Amino acid sequence: MRYMATYDLMETLRNTNQWLGATAAALGSYPATALAPNPFFQMMAAWGDVTERTFHRMTVKPDWGINTVVTKDGRERLVEVEKLVERPFGDLIKFNAVGRAPRERRILLVAPMSGHYATLLRSTVNSLLPEADVYVTDWHNARDIPVSEGKFDIEDYTLYLVDFMRHLGPDINVIAVCQPAPLTLAATAYLAELDPEAQPQTLTLIGGPIDPDAAATDVTDFGRRVTMGQLEEMAIQRVGFKYSGAGRMVYPGLLQLAGFMSMNAEMHSKAFADQIMRVTKGEASDHDKHNTFYDEYLAVMDMTAEFYLSTVERLFKDSEVARNAFVVNGHKIDIGKVTDVAVKTVEGSKDDITAPGQCVAALDLLTGLPEEKKASHLEPGAGHYGIFAGKSWRNNIRPMVLDFIDQNAGTHAKQAEKKRAEKAKAKTAPAAAKAKAEPSSSDEGGLPTRIPV
């Protein structure tokens, strides 16, 4: 079948490299090699160890690894991950701190669907969990979704976000990280028009390409240079028979990873060379800085072909969100209809993926939003990863975002309480009606309960 051979070829190459690494590690670790007065075998074993781990991580979904959290009362509590909404292409999950009362701050982290799993936001979740109830969009690997589940493009993605926001209520504070920023803005505008009472309380857009033409990067240059026909021929493949999604057209995560690494090839090459030397000297460990970062960075997932292609064509080439011309399910969204959601943008001055200017463009589109509900921040010296997971996030951006949420807490909380009360009433009403409708023992069949004496 067309494109399936190339998908299986990539998987074969990955598998072969993993096997070569394991073989080299085994050969270099034989006790007899210690007799050779030469570090060659030690270096071969180290190369094999690093290579095997690297190629193995590419197909493994990482665990969240968030087992406990220290709350404000100083107690360490267990953390459980609960699925609130389950869908074929992604779930809405909540991190429950066992025994902790619900927090006033409720935060929905919209994870990017750009080749990595939602666990890329692990440190972000960790930093917010002591301060808030945290919810995350957990997107699924397209290779594991049967073709029978249908398509999933940027319109479907937007409608998923709309449903998740509706489920969580109007006192939710949404933080969109990178890729989903324009679609999260569109979802908020969709609710502003069609279901105003379900709008989130605040919306924070972190390093998202709202207007890709505002500042050029390698990503935007690639989008302009390549035609959609070329992109479909070069990037789209069909999932092989090894996975549940056999036959589904996807943009493979391995291709996305290759693109990411080529942008900083010299840095990655040095990082792996240094790690091989550390393993040789016995200085490396399972959870050292290199392995902690690359175990997550190398774990990639496939995206549906229609999602990837529609992202490039409609968001980058046609700039539909930037032009306020985005259409969802036949409905043209007007971002100017957002009037009651406080919006903040965050950018990094050294972001080479979403350059400064691309994200802050969202504020110009919000023509119906009062100026006092708009805010922006440019973090000096921060790169793309740093603005949501690095030192800049922990020390500067996180406290600023939490303050922004607190400053804009208010009427939405009252709306949320009202909606929850209505939901609870709706749940109890059928049970009460059923109990009322059931005949009592005194009128069963119209017969008396006692025989008169």
Indicate residue ranges for each PLM-predicted region.
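Alpha/beta-hydrolase-fold enzymes
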Residues: 1-43, 47-48, 170, 187-306
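Conserved alpha/beta-hydrolase "acid-adjacent" motif
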Residues: 352-358
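Short beta-strand/loop motif that positions the catalytic acidic residue
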Residues: 338-339, 345-347, 351
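N-terminal targeting or regulatory segments adjacent to alpha/beta-hydrolase or S9 domains
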Residues: 1-75, 418-453
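Short, surface-exposed "cap/lid" segments of acyl-processing enzymes
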Residues: 67-145
